């Protein structure tokens, strides 16, 4: 599921990047259509209803809420031992706010994926044969969803490629 923004995670780092005490949050960015401060205050998306609706139709194998710790800490906790999540970076819909944070703070990409949700608020793992159906069900119910990768046997963790 796409995120609506930071979802209240990574604000310690964001404070350093934008120097809140000196008005850094009042800068307007064309790609946001607002100030960075307004973008940071975007309310957190809640996923309970779409997850429950999907669970009635498709067997969900794992759910990962991408909170503090980003991809590298949250996704592995939801997967069985010996399984890795292979995430296709090009499949992600990274929100402009994350690009701005990364560039302004000169933050390495791995740190961004280890701190922020990068535009993915929640990941749901289903069997490969159920993936397209799960996306269709969610979209038909009014919730945007898209496939960001797959799971594979291997070391526990996340591989972003």
Model-derived features: where do they sit?
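Phosphate/diphosphate-binding glycine-rich loops and adjacent basic-rich segments that engage nucleotide
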Residues: 1-29
């Amino acid at each position: 599921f796409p995120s609506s923004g930071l979802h209240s995670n990574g604000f310690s780092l964001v404070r350093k990047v934008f120097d809140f005490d000196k008005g850094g949050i009042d800068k307007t960015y064309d790609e946001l259509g607002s100030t960075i401060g307004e973008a940071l205050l975007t309310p957190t998306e809640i996923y309970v209803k779409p997850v429950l609706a999907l669970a009635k139709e498709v067997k969900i194998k794992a759910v990962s809420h991408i909170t503090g710790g980003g991809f590298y800490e949250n996704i592995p906790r939801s997967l069985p031992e010996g399984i890795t999540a292979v995430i296709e970076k090009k499949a992600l819909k990274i929100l402009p706010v994350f690009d701005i944070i990364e560039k302004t703070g000169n933050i390495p990409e791995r740190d961004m994926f280890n701190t922020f949700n990068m535009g993915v608020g929640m990941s749901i793992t289903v069997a490969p044969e159920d993936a397209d159906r799960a996306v269709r069900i969610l979209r038909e119910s009014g919730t945007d969803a898209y496939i960001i990768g797959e799971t594979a046997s291997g070391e526990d963790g996340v591989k972003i490629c």
